[in-house]
Design a protein with these regions (language model features):
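Rossmann-like NAD(P) dinucleotide-binding subdomain of oxidoreductase/dehydrogenase enzymes
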Residues: 120-276, 397
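Residue-level signal for inorganic ion chemistry
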Residues: 26, 63, 85, 177, ...
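N-terminal Rossmann NAD(P)-binding subdomain characteristic of aldehyde/semialdehyde dehydrogenases
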Residues: 56-57, 65-166, 210
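Structural signal for hydrophobic packing residues in well-ordered secondary-structure cores
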Residues: 51, 55, 71-78, 82, ...
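ALDH superfamily catalytic-core signature
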Residues: 232, 240-377, 440
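Conserved C-terminal structural/oligomerization subdomain of aldehyde/semialdehyde dehydrogenase
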Residues: 25-31, 230, 267, 360-482
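Short, structured beta/alpha segment
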Residues: 1-87
C-alpha cells in the first residue's frame, strides 16, 4: 500500500514527496508525501472534532469492541503487514512475523481487556460542623474519582519497531477515549499507512485516528509537537529528539511521555550458566542488528570467566548470518564512525568492525558487521554514547560493588540484564541497578501489564498496562455531600 496521510477519515497524498529507500540494497522503492503545516493543522482539528462529536464520551464496551476490530483487521492482513515491515526496515522476516506483528495485534487486545475492572477508590469524609438536625443529611460526603481522556494526543514513533511501537501508544490512547494524530518515522511509513487502512475499515468515527508523514525539524514533527491543539505528546526515539520535543511542549505546558535511548549493561557473574548467558548476550547485543532500545551495548563479565566469555562471544558474532542492515546510509555511516573511533581510542577488535561482503545486491545496502570490542576505558565515547548498532564493549569486574558501579556509570538508564545462579544476589543486585527494567537470566521477556520505561536520559514516565492508561487519561475527583 502506498504511503498516504489519513486525516479526518480520508486518505490523501498531497504535499511534496521524499524518497523511500530499501535498506537491503539501497534502491529507491517509493515516495512518501511530506505533510505541510496545513495538513498537520487539519489533522489536529479533525481529532478535536471527533472528540466533540462524542468519541471521548463513549463507554468502555464500545471502545473495547473497536480495539478488538482493529486487532482482527491486522490479523486478517498479517502477511501484508509482515511484507511492509520487512520492506521498510530490512529486518529478518522471522523477526517481523514472530515479534513485531503479533505484538502489535496483542497491544490492541490487551488494552481492550484492561478497560474492564480497573479499580477506583471511594472515601467517605465527615462534614465539618455538621449537626444531626432534620434534613441535614448524614454528615458525610462521598468522594470518588473518574477518569476522562486527555483529548488530542500526538504520537511520534520510531523506525526500529515501527508498527509495534506505534500500536504500543495508539492502543492505550484510543482505549482511554482520546483522539490521535500519529507521525511515524519518515524511514518507515508503510505499516503505519496499513494501520490507518485497518482502522478505517474497523469503523471508528472519522478523526479519531489521523496519520501524517514527514520529517521532524521544521516539518511535521515539530509542527505537531508545537501545536496548541495538542493535549499530550507520547514519543519514542533518541534522547536529543526528546529534549527538542520537550522544549516545544513547554510553550503550552503539554504533558509528555518519553521512551528514549539506552546504553544498556549486562552483568555476567562467574556462577552464571555460561551457555545461557552467552546465548542471551548474543541475542541482547545483536537482535535486529542492535537497533532496539533494549539491546545491550556494555557487557561486564566477572574476571574468572572474562577471557573465555570474550572469546566465545567473538566466535558467535563472527558466525552470525541472516542479520539485517542499518535503517539508512546515514545511520550506517554513524555506526561505522563509532567503530573507527573505538579503534582510535584504543579498543581491541575481537570480531567485526567493518562492512560485510555478500557478493550480491546486499553489497549496495546499509550493512555493518556484528562487532565485539574490548580494552576501552569507561570514559571512551563508545562506552558512554548510544551507538544503536550491532556492537558491544566487554570489560571485566572483580566484585559485585564494582559491577554495579560500572553499570550505573552512564547518562542512560533504560534496561539491564543480570546473569547469575545465586538467587540472593539477583534480588540484591537488581534493585541497585539504575535502570527502569532489569532482566535476570533472560532478556526482553515482556509482560504488557508491567511498567516499561527508563531513568536519567532514557525517558520520562512509564508505559504498559495501567501505566499507559493513567498517562492517557486524567483523574477527576467528585465529592457529593450525602
Amino acid at each position: 500500500m502506498k504511503a498516504a496521510h489519513y486525516v479526518g477519515g480520508g486518505f490523501r497524498t498531497d504535499g511534496a514527496a521524499f524518497a523511500l529507500v530499501d535498506p537491503v540494497d539501497g534502491r529507491r522503492v517509493g515516495d512518501v508525501p511530506e505533510a505541510t503545516r496545513q495538513i498537520v493543522d487539519e489533522a489536529v482539528r479533525a481529532a478535536r472534532a471527533a472528540l466533540e462529536d462524542g468519541w471521548g464520551r463513549t463507554g468502555a464496551t464500545e471502545r473495547a469492541a473497536a480495539l478488538r476490530r482493529i486487532a482482527d483487521g491486522i490479523q486478517a492482513r498479517f502477511d501484508e503487514f509482515v511484507d511492509a515491515e520487512v520492506a521498510d526496515t530490512g529486518k529478518p522476516r522471522e523477526l517481523a512475523a514472530t515479534v513485531d506483528i503479533p505484538r502489535a495485534i496483542g497491544n490492541f487486545r490487551a488494552y481492550a481487556d484492561l478497560l474492564y475492572g480497573r479499580p477506583e477508590r471511594a472515601y467517605t469524609t465527615d462534614v465539618p460542623g455538621w449537626s444531626a438536625t432534620p434534613g441535614a443529611g448524614t454528615g458525610q460526603a462521598l468522594n470518588y474519582s473518574v477518569r476522562r481522556p486527555l483529548g488530542v494526543v500526538a504520537i511520534i514513533s520510531p523506525w526500529n519497531l515501527p508498527l509495534l511501537l506505534l500500536t504500543w501508544k495508539v492502543a492505550p490512547a484510543l482505549a482511554a477515549g482520546n483522539a490521535v494524530v500519529a507521525k511515524p518515522s519518515e524511514e518507515t511509513p508503510s505499516t503505519a499507512t496499513l494501520l490507518a487502512s485497518v482502522i478505517d475499515q474497523a469503523g471508528l468515527p472519522d478523526g479519531v485516528f489521523n496519520l501524517v508523514h514527514g520529517h521532524g525539524t521544521d516539518a511535521a514533527g515539530e509542527w505537531l509537537t508545537r501545536h496548541p491543539g495538542v493535549d499530550a505528546i507520547a514519543f519514542t526515539g533518541e534522547s536529543a529528539t526528546g529534549a527538542a520535543i520537550m522544549r516545544n511542549a513547554a510553550d503550552h505546558i503539554t504533558p509528555v511521555s518519553f521512551e528514549l535511548g539506552g546504553k544498556n549493561p549486562a552483568l555476567i557473574f562467574a556462577d552464571a550458566d555460561f551457555d545461557a548467558a552467552l546465548d542471551g548476550t548474543v541475542r541482547s547485543c545483536f537482535t535486529h542488528s542492535g537497533q532496539i532500545c533494549l539491546c545491550t551495548e556494555r557487557v561486564y563479565v566477572e574476571r574468572p570467566v572474562f577471557e573465555e566469555f570474550v572469546a566465545a562471544l567473538g566466535e558467535r558474532a563472527r558466525a552470525l548470518e541472516g542479520y539485517g542492515p542499518m535503517i539508512s546510509a546515514q545511520h550506517r555511516d554513524k555506526v561505522l564512525s563509532y567503530y573507527r573511533l573505538a579503534v582510535e581510542e584504543g579498543a581491541t577488535v575481537v570480531a567485526g568492525g567493518g562492512v560485510p561482503t555478500f557478493g550480491d545486491d546486499r553489497d549496495n545496502g546499509f550493512y555493518v558487521e556484528p562487532t565485539v570490542l574490548t580494552g576501552l576505558p569507561e570514559t571512551a565515547r563508545l562506552v558512554r554514547e548510544e551507538v544503536f548498532g550491532p556492537v558491544c564493549h566487554v570489560a571485566p569486574f572483580d566484585t559485585e560493588d564494582e559491577a554495579l558501579r560500572l553499570a550505573n556509570d552512564s547518562p542512560y538508564g533504560l534496561a539491564a540484564t543480570v546473569w547469575t545462579r545465586d538467587l540472593s544476589r539477583a534480588h540484591r543486585v537488581a534493585p541497585r541497578v539504575e535502570t527502569g527494567i532489569v532482566w535476570v537470566n533472560c532478556w526482553n521477556l515482556r509482560d504488557l501489564r508491567t511498567p516499561f520505561g527508563g531513568v536519567k536520559a532514557s525517558g520520562i514516565g512509564r508505559e504498559g498496562g495501567e501505566y499507559s492508561l493513567d498517562f492517557f487519561s486524567e483523574p477527576v475527583n467528585v465529592c457529593i455531600q450525602i
